[in-house]
């Protein structure tokens, strides 16, 4: 009987995790961004492990990360590892980007406030590729609304961006300044340096193709 109960609990856990991952990621590929699949080349990965291991403190003290650096240095993968690891612990995480959020807001049948409130209900919100969205007045206003609502919810936020810390600390105008100020107040900046993993992956694919064509 105990074995049956344990198996049932295990099944329930797996169903819960599967559901969290289905609802939490905008792209199914993100489910593969795990510590187990890590290539070991990102020196910052121990900071991701630290975040997951100390999740209760991070949540209570509203500590987020601002992951910045050049394209392809592993920022999104790093954030995905945190998301997957917390989902495995049955913590609801939403990992999305502002292009998707702005599309959702335009197409959404529910009100704008309700949509943003729903985003802010997730214990952890991850915004990938911040700064890549269209910089219209409407777009910037919605970006601010989401960041500000998250700030007021006192729940942590993790952001990945190709923008430099200098450009975030010295914005060009007021519209960007109020967004960046909020981000820097909520998130500890972490610089990603090193080789471009995407370029390396592309090179590996090319080498494999050459092998196959021999």
Task: State each model region's role.
Residues 1-45, 200-214:
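A short, basic N-terminal segment
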Residues 44-49, 83-124, 134-141:
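Short glycine-rich substrate-engagement loop in P-loop NTPases that contacts/grips substrate
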Residues 47-59:
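Pre-Walker A adenine-sensing motif
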Residues 59-79:
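Walker A/P-loop nucleotide-binding motif
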Residues 62-66, 93, 124, 156:
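Residue-level preference for the first positions of well-ordered beta-strands
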Residues 72, 131-132:
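Catalytic acidic motif of RecA-like/P-loop NTPases
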């Amino acid at each position: 009987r105990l074995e049956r109960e344990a198996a049932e609990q295990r099944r329930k856990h797996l169903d819960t995790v599967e559901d969290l991952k289905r609802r939490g990621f905008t792209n199914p590929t993100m489910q593969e961004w795990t510590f187990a699949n890590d290539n070991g080349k990102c020196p910052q990965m121990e900071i991701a492990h630290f975040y997951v291991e100390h999740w209760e403190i991070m949540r209570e003290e509203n500590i987020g990360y601002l992951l910045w650096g050049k394209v392809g240095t592993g920022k999104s993968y790093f954030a995905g590892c945190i998301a997957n690891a917390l989902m495995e612990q049955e913590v609801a995480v939403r990992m999305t980007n502002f292009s998707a959020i702005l599309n959702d807001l335009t197409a959404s049948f529910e009100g704008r406030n309700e949509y943003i409130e729903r985003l802010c209900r997730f214990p952890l919100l991850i915004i990938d590729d911040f700064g890549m969205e269209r910089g219209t007045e409407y777009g910037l206003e919605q970006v601010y609304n989401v960041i500000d609502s998250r700030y007021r919810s006192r729940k942590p936020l993790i952001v990945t961006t190709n923008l430099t810390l200098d450009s975030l600390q010295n914005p060009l105008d007021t519209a960007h300044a109020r967004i960046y100020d909020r981000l820097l107040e909520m998130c500890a900046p972490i610089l990603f340096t090193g080789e471009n993993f995407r370029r390396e992956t592309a090179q590996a694919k090319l080498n494999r193709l050459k092998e196959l064509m021999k």
